[in-house]
Swiss-Prot record, chain B:
Gene from which this protein is expressed: MTO1
N6-methyllysine modified-residue sites: K508
Organism: Macaca fascicularis (Crab-eating macaque)
Known role: Component of the GTPBP3-MTO1 complex that catalyzes the 5-taurinomethyluridine (taum(5)U) modification at the 34th wobble position (U34) of mitochondrial tRNAs (mt-tRNAs), which plays a role in mt-tRNA decoding and mitochondrial translation. Taum(5)U formation on mammalian mt-tRNA requires the presence of both GTPBP3-mediated GTPase activity and MTO1 catalytic activity.
Gene3D superfamilies named among the record's database cross-references: FAD/NAD(P)-binding domain, GidA associated domain, C-terminal subdomain
Protein name: 5-taurinomethyluridine-[tRNA] synthase subunit MTO1, mitochondrial
Record field: compositional bias (Basic and acidic residues): 683-692
UniProt subunit comment: Homodimer; forms a dimer in the presence of potassium. Interacts with GTPBP3; forms the GTPBP3-MTO1 complex composed of homodimers of GTPBP3 and MTO1.
GO cellular component entries: cytosol; mitochondrion
Amino acid sequence: AVNKAEEPQNPPQLGHLAIIKPLVYLTLRLSLPDALIRLPSGSRLCTRRSSGAAAPGSGATIFALSSGQGRCGIAVIRTSGPSSGHALRILTAARDLPPARHASLRLLSDPRSGEPLDRALVLWFPGPRSFTGEDCVEFHVHGGPAVVSGVLQALGSVPGLRPAEAGEFTRRAFANGKLNLTEVEGLADLIHAETEAQRRQALRQLDGELGHLCRGWAETLTKALAHVEAYIDFGEDDNLEEGVLEQADIEVRALEVALGAHLRDARRGQRLRSGAHVVVTGPPNAGKSSLVNLLSRKPVSIVSPEPGTTRDVLETPVDLAGFPVLLSDTAGLREGVGPVEQEGVRRARESCNFLATVVASVGAQSPSDSSQRLLLVLNKSDLLSPEGPGPRPDLPPHLLLSCLTGEGLDGLLEALRKELAAVCGDPSTGSPLLTRARHQHHLQGCLDALSHYKPSKDLALAAEALRVARGHLTRLTGGGGTEEILDIIFRDFCVGK
Amino acid sequence: MFYLRGCGRWVAASFTKQQFPLVRLSSDSAAPRTPHFDVIVIGGGHAGTEAATAAARCGSRTLLLTHRVDTIGQMSCNPSFGGIGKGHLMREVDALDGLCSRICDQSGVHYKVLNRRKGPAVWGLRAQIDRKLYKQNMQKEILNTPLLTVQEGAVEDLILTEPEPEHTGKCRVSGVVLVDGSTVYAESVILTTGTFLRGMIVIGLEMHPAGRLGDQPSIGLAQTLEKLGFVVGRLKTGTPPRIAKDSINFSILNKQTPDNPSVPFSFTNETVWIKPEDQLPCYLTYTNPRVDEIVLNNLHLNSHVKETTRGPRYCPSIESKVLRFPNRLHQVWLEPEGMDSDLIYPQGLSMTLPTELQEKMITCIRGLEKAKVIQPGYGVQYDYLDPRQITPSLETHLVQRLFFAGQINGTTGYEEAAAQGVIAGINASLRVSRKPPFVVSRTEGYIGVLIDDLTTLGTSEPYRMFTSRVEFRLSLRPDNADIRLTLRGYKDAGCVSQQRYERACWMKSSLEEGISVLKSIEFSSSKWKNLIPEVSISTSRSLPVRALDVLKYEEVDMDSLAKAVPEPLKKYTKCRELAERLKIEATYESVLFHQLQEIKGVQQDEALQLPKDIDYLTIRDVSLSHEVREKLHFSRPQTIGAASRIPGVTPAAIINLLRFVKTTQQRQAAMNESPKTDQCLRNADRLQERQL
């Protein structure tokens, strides 16, 4: 039931529309939300490496949730790198490492608070006899989101550890000669899928308030850095305006305050949104809200016969066919209505705008290329007269449904189950838990780096602090090249002789 | 007209073939009396002189071909060397035993280190140079370089032969044809033609062909290169007018005095040739709204400014400054051109207005009210070759054994040219002796950043070095260029003298020893406070504090530390340079540790070499998009690291390439010991040794 999609605002013309006029399109768009924004390792490499963020070298120790996501009894979290043993000792509060390659039961606790996290099986694989050839640790923890999230955050707080980049475990294994060629074959496809999925995830994630914040911060920081760099490269001979450094200083300090406040706040406030993302979209009065209410078995959205009742994106977490799903109801896509509804339409488009291009370019031929899928649902089938003609035969594959009578619901659920299984079983989609750990890791890293910014002393050192801080932010937002810095310098200052 | 000196090394301007027997060095006794060299360098500018001497230092019989011998070492634009970023390049050129730093130590008239207060990683060694002295000293050095021959002549064409099968490229260069029809053969050829390729000088609406004011451009050579299939672009630059010194009223201007003591450019010099008190000052003045007015009212008379050819954003003409930043006062530095020169160089007034308007504008400026323009400012437009067509060893992809260095690759600046010159000279020589190329990585030096940027990203405006381009800026400092490059230059390139090598080795081991001693001395913070009362050591805990950490404080240097702990620290203060360098190492110690981790990561990618003979457009074993294939085909990255820096080359493509390298390696290993596999492995091994 994966369809080549019609542009939502431009539904296909039905031949016998006169008869089945009430039959309306609903498209269900499925995608995973909040999955890793892990930027693929290469995207960092493609920028000039001014980031200053940790490189995938032998130095850093990486960690990731390596079991699939979704509901599972046991989740496996892996680390690789020289600090693995150290991390294991810190989390188990033990002086000695467990015997190599033996499963041992240990109490894991948060090194910062001492709070117990889980009783878990831990395995210690000293290099080179390990998956990556480096020192590795596996934590087999109970699979609940709270436990997994807790352990990931605890690992992130250990100095020298950072969340893994896309494909980084495999890359390390490859570099250390631990993979044969057939194993690597799949890796490229995987990374490709990850890149594509992450691009959309990043877009989606960065659409929200947090993304807005991050981009703003990155912009401020890039500008401050550019001004400090201008002061270093040109300050001596050229007449930069007075107070360039002072202004940068003020901006950096303000940023520090904002980041600090956000991080303190984020620990309580950020809602963990786990599971696949299903967006219901279509023209007004198609019955999208009715479908959402039907699927969630509670009145999430107000329904009325009036077109344009839903004016915002309403999200509700539901259990669909055994999968955790975040179901979004959106405003009907139409033009020329009041400003509030237009905003709703804009948000609706935005919530799937990152799909539009993919849908158009991917089509039904290569659905595996994309984690984004589409189900075409024709609602109000109860209005079809049993003996009359059915929907036009040249329609793309679709499902018939009546939200009023519930007819066709089983078929829809079955189709959804298949789609969700495909989406959730897709190894390319990362865990939202890691996304959060990653966000926090980089924001904290940025804040730490900013605390080393002391322009009154060695300015090269101060600039380095800003470079590292910016590196952390641009890992979340993308960008981060040297050219951006030079562009700002030559835009803002008349330098050179 | 030119005299011969010293054992036939120096061949005076040879206008006729009859003089060639002097340089007949061909080993093939049956060959006709056609001159044959290991390396020919075309051009005697800053890239050419470094390239020729570097090749000769590496043991190659080298010929330097130039339009005019008396312009060798000419500083065609500003009368200064060094600066921020550029000074870094000069230190690296010097670390490879290049010339420009040593010559500057003998020819400067005003030495000043920029960025003194901003940290040693970004200090910019700079000097005003006496043009005449520089040229004299450079020519003396060139003429006394063993194995180096100099000849006057304009090159019209390249001699091309069948390619060597074991290398890529559609043909191989084996010599040059001069304008007079004579030929010279060589194993490698380096082109350092600067702005001479179809050079055009622009003043006002007048344009005439010239490489530099008064010099003929190279047109035949430009056509040859284009015919060979090189992608050619066009760039522009400019130079200000020169003003008569005695027509300037300096008394009302701000004076800038040189440093005391002067800091030399070269690692081998402890002082410069001239005392600070004998050096010349610079003066500062500003433009004003009347200057803006003249520019804006005469744009129709200024074809250079209107042209679309890309000029630099950072070395703008006064016209573009006025257009882009209106209603501001722009700085004008009045710089001496030399000890006995009557000219002043107004840095910041590069312009292409018609000559009479130039004087009119200049006399609007404070202090220059009565100034006389001796030579007008002018613009130059010239061809450059897209540098993505060369490898990091500066050899072209298209033509084997043909190397490009300097402005021909789209750079600007003497120092950028010199840096490429050294690398091209070394590699042209290594190519002759069939040794692996000498490539400086981004992690090793500014030279590496410069060449990597050019060869992987290309450039659309004249490329200039900035410290902000360098991601490992705190590691790649002016003070440690010798540790980074001299040892490698000696071992891998053979371009470094024994004496310099030994000095660098001594310095390296002394630094390492000094740092470990400083780490080993630990006292409580209260004891440190007693020992060095002037420093306020802030410690939150009562942990012992290392001497290295105390040395980080601004108020502390090796002298005060050695006074507090004479044994064993006293001996590290005997050598001034060592003491200063230990202080710098201490300043950056904590950051350098993190940076080293990152450098290792980059070097891992750099160690993964891509086979040179891949045809990216047709290769079947790798799944790559068409776009990626074209990009790889054009830039021909040599390592996975370089490939990953090309915009548009996706992570997936990188993984596919990785796989391809591995497969190729395995296949070659199976085919019993291929030199390429060896090389990959050797490079990986060398990485370990190369860590700072």
